[in-house]
Amino acid sequence: PRFYRRLRIPVSVHLPLAKWETRFDPQSTLKQDFHVTPETVVQVPMMKREDEYDYLLDRRLSCRVVGLPYQGNATALFILPSEGRMHKAEAGLDQETLTKWFKKFTKRKLQLYLPKFSIEGSYQLEKILPKLGIRDLFTSHADLGGLTNHSNIQVSEMVHKAVVEVDESGTQAAAATGMVLGFRSARMGAQVVVFNRPFLMAIVNPEGVLFLGKVARPAEGHF
């Protein structure tokens, strides 16, 4: 049998500054409760914008999905599982699901409430990338000629570190306000969608997934 040397690759990614196609008004950002758990509530700066968004309700995964385009060709997907269904949504999030969502999106007028947050974390890509259709990298079929001169190298572990900051303008942090927000009644025809409990976020472009993470506690930036 042929023996392969194992290679551990650290990958650090700080996503470049990206602006929303339509920014949030900072004057509409106010403090609001975020339910980390049914028993734990923290105050977070909550952005608000009423507009038409790409939207769908995935009944199979028990979640709502809202798409916010950046300037250029990238889109942020915010995924809000029904209460108690986070694990179900996480388990079903793969390349096939993302592709299906983009095909099934419809334009819907929403009054969207989304917390500002900054998250940083590390996770094992060898567990995530196969779900997104990338498998050969962790087998003997991978072409690693650009990384090493050895021919008998196989990736056993890839550690990904990502930083994402989301605010009114896009992926850039800003100071929070000290006021308290009360949800206003939406205008006629607008549906209210409030991200006030743990949710998932993906940033995608035509080439693939740039970022995938879970926002569990915006005030403290936890994955």
Outline where the language-model segments fall.
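Secretory/exported precursors with cleavable N-terminal leaders
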Residues: 1-223
